[in-house]
Amino acid sequence: EKNKIRPRGQRDSSYYWKMEASEVMLSTRIGSGSFGTVYKGKWHGDVAVKILKVVDPTPEQLQAFRNEVAVLRKTRHVNILLFMGYMTKDNLAIVTQWCEGSSLYKHLHVQETKFQMFQLIDIARQTAQGMDYLHAKNIIHRDMKSNNIFLHEGLTVKIGDFGLATVKSRWSGSQQVEQPTGSVLWMAPEVIRMQDDNPFSFQSDVYSYGIVLYELMAGELPYAHINNRDQIIFMVGRGYASPDLSRLYKNCPKAIKRLVADCVKKVKEERPLFPQILSSIELLQHSLPKINRSAPEPSLHRAAHTEDINACTLTTSPRLPVF
C-alpha cells in the first residue's frame, strides 16, 4: 500500500522535497540550538541536517510543518542558506546546504575578528537584504541572531534557521514547545512578554536585527553589565532597559547609530521595516569614499534568481551566553 504511487494531481507539493532517512548519512554532531541538534551529513555531497525538538508530532503539527516546508522550498537568495529538503521518519528534520564559514557570533565574540567599518556595514546590508527577501516571501524568521548568520567564503552573508513557526511556537494541548532560552538578548520586548498568542511579526524580526547591528557596531553583546538572565527578561520586557548606544564604536556612522536606535524601539509600530532599512544602508554605502566600499559581487544583483549550492555551515557557533 505504502509504495503505491498516487496520481500526480493528488500530491502535496512538499512530497517532492521529502527525503528518506536512509538516503541521508549523518556524521559529525555540530551543536545543539534552541530548536534542535545539527549534524553534518552526506546527501549527494555535504549537507547540514537539523533534527528538530518535536517529539511525537500531532497530525496538525505534521501538516503545519509540511505547509511551511512548501514555503521554505521556494526560497532562493544569495544571502539565505539553501533549503534542500525535509524528513519526517522518527523525527522532523530539515536539510540545508553545508557551509564552511563561521557564524557572525563566533567572529565577533569568540575569534574577535577585526573587521573594518566598511566591512561591518556591508555585513549589515547583506543581512538586511536577506531579511527583506524573507519578509517579501511572508516568512518571519523568529530567531534572528548572530548565531544564525554565517560568513561564507570571506564576507558573503548566509542567514539560516528561518521560518518553521510550527517548531518555534507554543502549541496548546500536550505539545508545548518552549520559547528559546538562548535567544533572550535578541528577543523583542513584546516577544519576551508573550501576552499575545503570536507576538512574532516583521517588527519583532527588525528588533532582533537591531541587536545584531548593535553587536556589529559595538563588538560586544548588549547588557554586558547585567549577568542575570531573568533580570534581562524583566528589564527588557517591561521596557526599562535597551542597548546602550554610547558603547558603539566612535567611528560608527550617525546613520547606522540612528538605525540601531530605530530598530530597537520598544513600541513595535515605531520600528522601520526592511525595505527602508536596506535603503538607508545602501544610501550610506554610496556616500562612503570609494576606497572603503566593498567590491560588489555580481551574484548580489541577481539575488532573487541565484541558486547557490556552495557549502555553508549551519552552526559552528559556540554555546550561547547564559542569557
From Swiss-Prot:
InterPro entries: Kinase-like_dom_sf, Prot_kinase_dom, Protein_kinase_ATP_BS, Ser-Thr/Tyr_kinase_cat_dom, Ser/Thr_kinase_AS, Ser/Thr_Kinases-Pseudokinases. Keywords: ATP-binding, Kinase, Nucleotide-binding, Oncogene, Serine/threonine-protein kinase, Transferase. Its EC number is 2.7.11.1. It holds the Pfam family PK_Tyr_Ser-Thr. PROSITE patterns: PROTEIN_KINASE_ATP, PROTEIN_KINASE_DOM, PROTEIN_KINASE_ST. Residues 24-284 form the Protein kinase domain. It catalyses: L-seryl-[protein] + ATP = O-phospho-L-seryl-[protein] + ADP + H(+); L-threonyl-[protein] + ATP = O-phospho-L-threonyl-[protein] + ADP + H(+). ATP binds at I30, G31, S32, G33, S34, F35, G36, T37, V38, K50. It is an enzyme of class 2 (transferase). Transmembrane segments: none annotated. The keyword Lipoprotein does not apply. GO terms for molecular function: ATP binding; protein serine kinase activity; protein serine/threonine kinase activity. It comes from the Viruses. SMART domains: S_TKc. The active site is at D143. Coiled coil: none annotated. This protein is synthesized as a Gag-Raf polyprotein. Belongs to the protein kinase superfamily. TKL Ser/Thr protein kinase family. RAF subfamily. This is Serine/threonine-protein kinase-transforming protein raf.
